[in-house]
Amino acid sequence: MLELARQLHQDAAEKGDSSFFALRPSLGIDFICWDAEDCGTPSFDAHGENHESTWCLGSQYWSGKHHVDGYTARYGINLDMVGNANSIFFRETISMLYAPSVVDKVWAAAHRIGYGKFFSYEDGGAVTDDHVQVNRSGIPCIDVIATDTNSGGFPATWHTMNDNMKYISKETLKAVGQTMLEVMWTEQ
């Protein structure tokens, strides 16, 4: 997110303008860092049910109380675990239910600029993630999330001591970042 914001600012500065919004006054971009996404009751908890209300606390709060009265957004793109080497992003099920046109827009952008190997048109599974809360607030939102092609779950290093910078791929981050910039610059 920081690099995307830097790129937007740099592009505006190169054009002699200090504000991205002056270049594209109809387009506002919110960068949001969610918190407490993974704090939920595990599905294997023997002491009770898997309470959905215990997950994605940051996006629950934001979705229930927008930062500005009358806030609206055309759509959202939630980026989660988008830096692993050899990542492939499938069309996540909840994204396809609530925001198929946004999925199509992002995947088409990736393929148009040469990053199709990262964005598969195959359908993936459903993931309880921050985009669920945003969709429930009435804003179509998708989840770009890496899943392991062998297991159908998350990468093997997820939530382990090996979940560290060693496994972050510059190539994958570039593919996702360039795709997001393409989506932003071509938005009407």
Report residues per predicted region.
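Active-site-adjacent substrate-binding region
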Residues: 75, 82-188
